Swiss-Prot record:
Any matching Pfam family: RdRP
Keyword Transmembrane: no
UniProt EC number: 2.7.7.48
Upper classification of the organism: Eukaryota, Viridiplantae, Streptophyta, Embryophyta, Tracheophyta
Organism: Oryza sativa subsp. japonica (Rice)
Protein name, as recorded: Probable RNA-dependent RNA polymerase 4
Tissue: Expressed in shoot apical meristem (SAM) and panicles.
Domain of life: Eukaryota
Record InterPro entries: RNA-dep_RNA_pol_euk-typ (IPR007855)
Reactions catalysed: RNA(n) + a ribonucleoside 5'-triphosphate = RNA(n+1) + diphosphate
Length: 1183
C-alpha cells in the first residue's frame, strides 16, 4: 500500500514554494503524509486556492486523513469554480488578467505575531502582548474550536456544509463602490462570527444562538500547533485582508477574515497579483482624489430608486483606464472634480452631493465619512466628503486624516418602527468584514456618544417625535492597504487591541461600560500643546477627601467622597503656552498646535496673560487623564499635578517601560515617511477648552421654576421678559439692541450681522435688516421657552481651592476686575432639585491670589466640609463643568435656599463584566453590539424624567394644593430627580434606568407644546403666552423695505470679464442650492452641505479660507467682492426676495465689510469680536 495513502504510484507534481512549505508543516504536525493525488489536486488549484485549502485544514479541530481532507476541499474549490465559471490554474494560464476566484483567500481562525511553542487550550497570553496568541475557545469549557461557528438568525437551518466543517472564502473583486450584503440569502456564510477577528467572536451570552456546522466528529484530535512561521498563511492573510464587501455585488455573502486585524508589512506584491491595474494605478494619486472617485461611484441619487443590483458604472474598471487615472494626477482639485463628475459622477450621485470645498488650506482638517444604509434588505456603503473642519481630534493627529473614517449607520426609512434585531443582523457584518475602499480596509475602532448636553437635546427631540440626527458617532480606522503610498504606517503589524494601546492602555479599565466612554477621549476636538512630555514632571497627588466633624473620611456606598473630583494643578510656564481664550477647541485661526507665540492667540494681546483653568486630555505613557488643571505659581517649571479622580486609564504594568513618543513627533515622522513600527505609546497634552470671560447669560424653564419655587416673585421674571421682548423688537432700529442680538447668534452667522454693524454699514441695509428681523424672531422663540437674558450673572468654569483656606460655604469668584466679595447664587445645569441652587459667600483670598496670579474667570470651591459643594449641585465635578453664578441683587434678596440634594436611590451592585472577561475577538463583537444598541435602542430615561418633573413643578407653582397632595407631588418629584441623576451617569456605570408608570403624567402644560395639554397659568405659562403674542413686535407692522444697493459697492467699476466669470459661478450656485433645498435630508446634513458650498466660492474669491488669509492683491479681491454683491442684489431685486442677497455676504462678507470701512470711514480700529461679544450693550427701552 502506498504509504502516502494513494492506491497507485503517481509522480508528485511541483508545488509552489509557499504551498509546499505549508503542506510540510501540516504533515509534520499531523504525523501523516499527503498522497500524490492530493498534491496533484493542490497544484491544479493554483497557489491562492491551495493556500486557502491548507489553511482551512490547519484550522480544523480534528483531521481523520490528511489526503482525504485535501481531496474533499479541493473538490469543493472546483465546484465553486465551476458554479462561477472560473478557470483552474492550468486553464487560467492561457487567460490574461487575474481571475476573481483566485483573489479569494480565506484566513485562519487565530492570529499571533509570534506563535508560542506548545500552548495548551487553556493557556492564554494577554491580549495585545507581543507574544499574543488568540485562545482557541468559543465556549467557556476551554476547548479549542476547529469548527466554524455561525449565527443562525431565527434558528434557520444551516446550509450545506462539508464533512469537516464549512469553509468559505472572501471575494475581492475589482471593487464596486456601493457595497451590499444580504443576510437572508440561502447560502449563509459562517464567517460572520468566526473567532479571531474583531467583532467576529461571539460572546458567551449569545451561545444559544450559535450552531456548529460540522455534522461529523472525526475521531483523531489535531496535535497542537508549532511556532514555525507559515509563508502560506502569511501570503493568504495579506491578500485576504484586502478582500471585502466593496468588491462584490449584492448577491454573494462575503466572509470576514477571522483574525484580529493585523497589517502585513509586505502586502503590495501579493496584492498586485490579484487586483486590476486600475486599482494599483489609483495608488499614484493623493488619497483625497481616490476617496472622491469612490464617493462619486457610490449610488446615492436623491429621489431616484436605487437599482436592484450594483450598477455597472459603479466598478472603477468600467469607467477609468490606467492612463486616464494617471492623467488625473497632475490636475488641480477643481479640474479633477470636474473630470470625474462629467465622466461618471453624474450617473451616480446628485449634483448637490458634489465636493464643494476643493482648495482648503493645509491646516484644515479633512473628515472622511461613510454612510451605511439598508436598502431592500441589502447593506450599502456610501462614501461622502471629505468635509472640512478647523479642528482635529487626537485620533486624526496620530493616524492622519485619511486613515480615519466617520461611519454613520443609518436608520431604515419606514412608517413603522424597525426592530433592533434587524440592525444587528445587517450591521454586525460591516464590523466583521470592515469597510473596503480600493486597496484599503477600515475596521471598527470606537464610538462616541454625543455627550450629556447633545444627548439630552436629542432625547428631547425624540420625546417630541421630531426628526433628528443621532449624536452617536462611530469611527473606523485604516488597518490594511495594498498601496505603496500607505507605508510606512503606525498601525502596520498591530492588532486592533495593540492599536488602541498606542493611545491608552484601555485594557486596564474595570468595566465594559467605561471602555468606550474612556477610549472616546481621543476623539475630542482639541489643540495640542507644543511641549515635550518627557521633559515634564507629571506627578500623581492625592485627592482632598471630605472629612466629618471628627476629621474622619466620609464614604457613600463604599466610595470615598472627595472635594477635588477632576481637577489638578499646572505650573505657570506651561499655562503661559496655552491659548487664553479657547472654547471647545476653537481658535481664531485654524491650527492644531499651541506654542509660546501667545500674541497670535485670540482674546489676548498680552503674552503675560494665561488661563486660570485648562480643560485637558493628557495621554502619558499609556495612561489617560481627563479633567482641568489650575495654574499654580508655587509649582516648579514644567510640572503637572494630577489626581486619581482625573486618571481614567492607568498604565498597564507589563507595558510601563515601552517606547513612548510625542504626538507632534508622530506627525513629523508620518510626513517624512519614517517608520513608526517601534512606537508603542503616544504622549500628548491636548487642550479642550480654557476658562474664559463669561458671555451673556440666560435663564431656562428649569432655572426659572427653581428660582420661583425658592421665593423669587413673578414680577421679577415678567420684568426681565418685557425688557427682552422690547430689545428683540427694537433690534432692527437701534445699534445697541442690534449688536446684542447679533452677538447672541454669532456662531450661527459667522458674526456677519455684527461685522456689518461694526463696519459702519447702516442698519437700513436690506440684507442686514432681513437678518436682524430673522434673529429677532429666533430671540422671541427662545424667550418663549424661558431663555431670557439676565444681568449680573456669569458662566464660570469651576475648580477646587488650592490653598485649603476657604470655609465650607465659601467660594472664590474671579471676574474681569478681580475677586468678588458678598453673597452669590451658584447653580449647575441641568439641576432639577431645589437644593441645586446654593447661596454661597464669595470671599476675597490673598492666598489664592498668590497661587493664581492675575488669572481670571473661574469659581473656586472649598476643600473643607463633609461633602463637595459640586456634588451637592446635580452631582457635578470639576472636570470642565460650567457653573451659573449670580450677583443679581434682586435674586439674592428674594431667594431662599433649600436643603441640598442627597441621593436616595442606590444603583444595583451587580458585578459587571470587564474587558478581561473576553478574548479580543469576543470583545470586538461585544463593543460593536453595544454601539448598535446605543445607536438604535437608546434610553430616553433622562428626557422622560425631566419632562415629568417639569409638569409636576408646574402644578406646584400653579394650583392651590392641600398639604397631602403637595407632599405626594413633591415625593414624586424627588424620585424623578434621583432617577434623572442616575440616568445622567448610567452610560459609565453600566446601569439601565426605567421610569415607573406611576411617575408618568397624562397631560402637559401648553408651554411644553405636547399633547394632550392643559393651559398653565404658572410663571412659565405666562412667559410663553406673552412672548408668543405677536402684537408687541414692531417688525410685524413694518412693511417690507425695497431691496436697494449701497453706492459704495454698486458704483465700483468691475471689469466685464470678472463680472461674467462670477455671473457664471452664481448661476452654478443657484443650481446647486436649489437641489440642496429639495433634498429630503436631515437639517444637520443640509447645513454642512450649504456651508461647504459657500466655502467653495470663498476659496475661489480669496484663494484661502478667509479674507484675512488671502495671498491675492486686495484691490482685485475688492473688485470681485463688489461684482458678487452687484450680481446677487440684481437677482434679489428681480425676484423680490431679499434672501438672495445672502450669497454676497456669506461668500464675500468679510471683504465687503473691510472695503466699506476703508472707503467710508478712513480710520479703523482693530478689535476682537470675541471680546466684544462678551459685552452687553445696556440701553433700556421704555415706552
Amino acid at each position: 500500500m502506498n504509504p502516502h495513502g494513494g492506491g497507485n504510484q503517481m509522480r508528485e507534481p511541483a508545488l509552489p514554494a509557499a504551498v509546499g512549505a505549508e503542506l510540510e508543516r501540516l504533515e509534520a504536525r499531523l504525523g501523516q503524509l499527503a498522497c500524490a493525488e492530493a498534491r496533484r489536486q493542490l497544484a491544479e488549484l493554483g497557489e491562492p486556492a491551495a493556500a486557502r485549502v491548507l489553511r482551512a485544514i490547519g484550522e480544523a479541530r480534528q483531521v481523520r486523513t490528511l489526503s482525504g481532507f485535501i481531496r474533499h476541499m479541493a473538490n469543493q474549490e472546483r465546484m465553486k469554480r465551476n458554479a462561477r465559471g472560473i478557470p483552474t490554474a492550468h486553464s487560467a494560464a492561457c487567460i490574461s488578467g487575474p481571475c476573481r476566484e483566485e483573489e479569494s483567500i480565506s484566513t485562519p481562525l487565530y492570529y499571533n505575531e509570534v506563535q508560542m511553542d506548545a500552548q495548551t487550550p487553556n493557556d492564554m497570553v494577554e491580549v495585545g502582548s507581543p507574544n499574543q496568541q488568540m485562545p482557541l475557545r468559543l465556549h467557556d469549557n476551554g476547548g479549542s474550536v476547529g469548527h466554524i461557528a455561525r449565527v443562525v438568525p431565527d434558528l434557520a437551518n444551516p446550509a450545506v456544509g462539508s464533512p469537516y466543517g464549512r469553509i468559505s472564502s472572501v471575494l475581492l473583486q475589482n471593487q464596486n463602490c456601493v457595497e451590499g450584503y444580504t443576510p437572508s440569502r440561502g447560502m449563509v456564510s459562517p464567517a460572520s462570527n468566526q473567532v479571531g477577528s474583531p467583532g467576529h467572536r461571539m460572546p458567551s451570552g449569545l451561545q444559544r444562538h450559535m450552531e456548529i456546522d460540522s455534522p461529523i466528529q472525526p475521531i483523531v484530535s489535531t496535535p497542537e500547533r508549532v511556532s514555525t512561521p507559515s509563508p502560506v498563511r502569511d501570503l493568504s492573510r495579506c491578500v485576504e485582508n484586502m478582500a471585502g464587501p466593496s468588491g462584490s455585488p449584492p448577491c454573494p455573502i462575503w466572509v470576514m477574515p477571522q483574525i484580529p486585524p493585523a497589517i502585513c508589512p509586505d502586502t503590495t506584491n501579493v496584492l498586485r497579483e490579484v487586483v486590476s491595474p486600475q486599482m494599483l494605478a489609483l495608488g499614484e494619486l493623493e488619497f483625497r482624489k481616490i476617496f472622491m472617485i469612490f464617493a462619486y461611484l457610490s449610488w446615492n441619487k436623491k429621489g431616484v430608486k436605487p437599482p436592484l443590483s450594483t450598477p455597472k458604472s459603479s466598478k472603477i474598471e468600467d469607467v477609468l483606464s490606467v492612463d486616464s487615472i494617471r492623467s488625473l494626477k497632475s490636475m488641480s482639485m477643481a479640474q479633477f472634480e470636474s473630470r470625474i463628475w462629467s465622466t461618471f459622477g453624474h450617473d451616480n450621485i446628485s449634483s448637490s452631493d458634489r465636493a464643494k470645498n476643493l482648495d482648503s488650506g493645509p491646516g484644515m482638517s479633512k473628515v472622511y465619512h461613510c454612510n451605511v444604509e439598508i436598502r431592500g434588505g441589502t447593506v450599502v456603503k456610501i462614501f461622502k466628503g471629505p468635509y472640512i473642519e478647523n479642528r482635529r481630534t487626537h485620533l486624526q493627529k496620530v493616524l492622519g486624516d485619511d486613515n480615519v473614517l466617520v461611519v454613520k449607520f443609518m436608520e431604515i426609512s419606514s412608517d413603522t418602527e424597525t426592530d433592533l434585531s434587524t440592525y444587528l443582523e445587517h450591521y454586525h457584518k460591516v464590523a466583521e468584514e470592515g469597510i473596503v475602499l480600493g486597496l484599503r480596509c477600515y475596521r471598527f475602532f470606537l464610538y462616541k456618544d454625543g455627550g450629556k448636553e447633545n444627548k439630552m437635546k436629542e432625547e428631547n427631540r425624540e420625546e417630541e417625535n421630531k426628526k433628528c440626527t443621532s449624536s452617536v458617532r462611530c469611527y473606523f480606522v485604516r488597518t490594511e492597504s495594498g498601496w505603496n503610498m500607505d507605508e510606512p504606517y503606525i498601525l502596520s503589524g498591530r492588532t486592533i487591541g495593540q492599536a488602541r494601546d498606542l493611545f491608552m492602555h484601555i485594557r486596564t479599565v474595570l468595566t465594559l461600560a467605561k471602555y468606550m466612554l474612556r477610549f472616546a477621549l481621543i476623539v475630542s476636538k482639541t489643540i495640542t500643546l507644543d511641549v515635550d512630555l518627557s521633559e515634564v514632571l507629571v506627578k500623581l497627588i492625592d485627592d482632598e477627601p471630605c472629612l466629618d466633624e471628627h476629621g474622619k473620611e466620609v464614604f457613600r456606598d463604599g466610595e470615598r467622597l472627595i472635594h477635588t473630583d477632576g481637577t489638578g494643578l499646572i505650573s505657570e510656564d506651561l499655562a503661559q503656552k496655552c491659548t487664553y481664550s479657547n472654547s471647545k477647541g476653537k481658535l481664531l485661526e485654524p491650527q492644531d498646535i499651541v506654542d509660546c507665540a501667545a500674541s497670535k492667540l485670540m482674546g489676548s494681546n498680552n503674552t503675560t496673560e494665561y488661563p486660570l483653568l485648562i480643560q485637558l486630555r493628557l495621554f502619558y505613557n499609556g495612561s489617560a487623564v481627563k479633567g482641568t488643571v489650575l495654574v499654580d505659581k508655587r509649582l516648579p517649571p514644567r510640572t503637572i499635578h494630577i489626581r486619581p479622580s482625573m486618571l481614567k486609564i492607568k498604565t498597564y504594568p507589563e507595558l510601563s517601560g515601552v517606547q513612548s513618543v510625542n504626538s507632534l513627533d508622530i506627525v513629523s515622522a508620518r510626513n517624512a515617511k519614517k517608520s513608526l513600527s517601534g512606537v508603542q505609546s503616544v504622549n500628548s497634552f491636548e487642550i479642550v477648552s480654557t476658562s474664559n470671560r463669561s458671555g451673556r447669560t440666560f435663564t431656562s424653564n428649569n432655572l426659572i421654576a427653581l428660582l420661583h419655587y425658592g421665593g423669587v416673585p413673578e414680577e421679577f421674571f415678567m420684568e426681565l421678559l418685557q425688557t427682552a421682548i422690547e430689545e428683540a423688537d427694537n433690534a432692527r432700529f437701534d445699534y445697541a439692541g442690534a449688536l446684542n442680538i447679533a452677538f447672541n447668534y454669532a456662531d450661527m452667522e459667522d458674526s456677519m450681522p455684527a461685522r456689518m454693524i461694526l463696519s459702519g454699514i447702516p442698519l437700513e441695509e436690506s440684507y442686514l435688516q432681513s437678518r436682524l428681523d430673522f434673529l429677532s424672531l429666533l430671540e422671541r422663540k427662545g424667550i418663549k421657552n424661558g431663555k431670557i437674558p439676565i444681568d449680573d450673572c456669569y458662566y464660570l468654569m469651576g475648580t477646587a481651592d488650592p490653598t485649603g483656606k476657604l470655609g465650607p460655604n465659601e467660594v472664590c469668584v474671579i471676574l474681569d476686575y478681580g475677586q468678588v466679595s458678598g453673597d452669590v447664587l451658584v447653580y449647575k445645569y441641568p439641576g432639577l432639585h431645589p437644593g441645586d441652587i446654593h447661596v454661597l459667600k464669595a470671599t476675597y483670598s490673598s492666598d489664592i491670589e498668590k497661587v493664581v496670579g492675575n488669572s481670571k474667570h473661574a469659581i473656586l470651591f472649598p476643600t473643607t466640609g463633609q461633602r463637595s459643594l459640586a456634588d451637592e449641585m446635580a452631582n457635578s465635578d470639576f472636570d470642565g463643568d460650567i457653573y451659573w453664578v449670580s450677583l443679581n441683587p434682586k435674586l439674592l434678596e428674594h431667594f431662599k435656599p433649600s436643603k441640598p440634594w442627597v441621593p436616595a436611590i442606590t444603583p444595583n451592585g451587580t458585578k459587571q463584566k470587564g474587558p478581561e472577561d473576553f478574548n479580543e475577538s469576543e470583545l470586538e463583537r461585544v463593543l460593536f453590539h453595544e454601539f448598535l444598541k446605543t445607536r438604535f435602542a437608546p434610553s430616553y430615561a433622562r428626557a422622560t424624567a425631566a419632562t415629568n418633573w417639569l409638569v409636576y413643578m408646574d402644578r406646584l407653582l400653579t394650583v392651590s394644593l392641600d398639604e397631602s397632595e403637595k407632599k405626594l407631588i413633591e415625593k414624586k418629584m424627588l424620585k424623578l430627580v434621583d432617577l434623572y441623576y442616575l440616568a445622567l451617569d448610567a452610560p459609565k456605570m453600566g446601569n439601565k434606568v426605567n421610569i415607573p408608570r406611576d411617575l408618568m403624567v397624562k397631560q402637559y402644560p401648553h408651554f411644553m407644546d405636547r399633547s394632550p395639554s392643559y393651559h398653565s397659568s404658572s410663571i412659565l405659562g405666562k412667559i410663553y403666552d406673552k412672548a408668543g403674542d405677536p402684537k408687541p413686535l414692531r417688525s410685524d407692522n413694518v412693511q417690507p423695505t425695497s431691496i436697494s444697493s449701497l453706492p459704495c459697492f454698486a458704483e465700483r467699476d468691475v471689469p466685464p470679464a470678472i463680472k461674467q466669470l462670477w455671473q457664471h459661478r452664481y448661476n452654478e450656485y443657484l443650481a446647486d442650492s436649489s437641489l440642496l433645498y429639495a433634498e429630503e435630508a436631515d437639517e444637520e446634513e443640509k447645513k454642512i452641505k450649504f456651508q461647504e458650498l459657500y466655502e467653495k466660492y470663498k476659496h475661489l474669491l480669496y484663494g484661502a479660507s478667509e479674507f484675512e488669509e488671502t495671498p491675492r492683491d486686495l484691490d482685485d479681491v475688492f473688485s470681485e467682492a463688489c461684482a458678487i454683491y452687484q450680481i446677487a442684489y440684481e437677482k434679489a431685486r428681480s425676484a423680490n426676495n431679499v434672501a438672495r442677497c445672502g450669497f454676497a455676504w456669506k461668500v464675500a462678507g468679510r471683504a465687503l465689510c473691510h472695503f466699506y470701512t476703508v472707503k467710508n470711514e478712513g480710520n479703523a480700529v482693530v478689535c476682537s469680536l470675541q471680546l466684544l461679544r462678551n459685552f452687553r450693550f445696556t440701553k433700556k427701552y421704555r415706552k
